[in-house]
Amino acid sequence: MKTDKEIAEIIYYDCGEVTALGFYINGFLSDQIKYNYKFLIKREKPSFLKHPSFTGEWGKFVLRLGLFEFKNGNNNFFFSIDRSDHSTNFKNEGYIIPLLEIVKYYFKANYNATAIDNDPEIKKYRDKIIPIGPSFPLHIENMIKFMPRVLPGKNNNWTFKESKERLNLMFRNPRLSYLRGLRNTETDLNVFFVMPYYPNQKILNEFRFEVMKALQKHVKTNLIIGFAPTQKLPENHQYFEQPVYEMRTYFRNLARSKVAIYVRGPHDGLSSKLGQLLALGKPIIGQTIHNNKELYYQNPFFNEQFAYDEPEDIAKQVQELLQHPEKAASFAKANANTFDTKFSPEITVSKIIEKLFD
């Protein structure tokens, strides 16, 4: 049996964006007793970031990832978690090449084996790149440990923008228990489909716009659809404008919907909505999943729910499912169970931990 001095450590370097990592951090915090390790937070950059290879664009992109260190006796190494949208190395945003050279494992949510094999530069690191499950922004349970990063200042090299992001994490994002608690919400809406508008993602916006038009055509009544923009919408999109909802209000409205809709995120990546809708236990109709397919399509009813890549088909299938509430209920029950047994923070991170100890 290990003594306290021999207990393994997993160290998170709190030196960048953490909103996308809150899901995984909750998992690391929760799994400490089960796997007999300590989860520690260092408010500094790992030593390897001082290397000249991390200047320029690499230095900018690397802080979007989660940077960690595993220490277990003489078995010490760095690993990273990448929740970025790209499955390819488009504009060097899909992978951080210098980081791939350093870490033992590069855990990636938007894992795509074909994209890896098609890129000779990335393929060299194939064995390091490990697929992981979905995530979405969550309140971190031990948020007090992140408090020193709230106030900007020269001493901690923390900007106002980064401090604002940290405050959002503290007060804006809900706890997972809140989402699970919404599973029994009375469903008095047919559809709630309100999406952000990304000025730099024209194709994505147009697809969502076409889905909205198709929903209006086929579902027609008792629906809330539109964009919730942070700046003025193009004139032809303004008919579908919605207010920016407070986060908990947004989820309450999602929970009210009889059928939820899933569309892919930027660059055809996994949207955080996937995990959120599963956590809410909603029946889903939506686009096919492009990345990490093997992880998802083995689950009950995923082949039926994530099967439609045309806006008209999505809207028609939503209307069809609305006519069959028993089928929708079976989807909902299965999705809640899939999240609880396969995609919760604790279970998702347990797969990472088992790899670290392997």
Predicted regions and their residues:
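Short, aromatic/basic amphipathic alpha-helical patches
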Residues: A20-Q32, E93-P98, I116-D127, F207-A214, ...
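Short, solvent-exposed loop/turn segments at secondary-structure junctions
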Residues: C15-V18, E44-P46, S84-T88, Y111-T114, ...
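Short, surface-exposed amphipathic charged segments that create phosphate/polyanion-binding patches used
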Residues: S53-W58, K145-L151, Q238, K316-H324
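N-terminal pre-catalytic "stem/leader" segment of glycosyltransferase-like enzymes
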Residues: M1-G94, Y111, F193-P199, L204, ...
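Catalytic binding pocket for nucleotide-activated donors in carbohydrate/polymer assembly enzymes
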Residues: N236-F240, M247-F357
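Catalytic donor nucleotide-activated moiety binding site of glycosyltransferases and closely related
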Residues: F209-M247, H290
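Short, glycine/acidic-rich beta->alpha junctions
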Residues: A20, K60-V62, F207, Y245, ...
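Catalytic core of nucleotide-activated saccharide and alditol-phosphate transferases
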Residues: G73-K202, F209
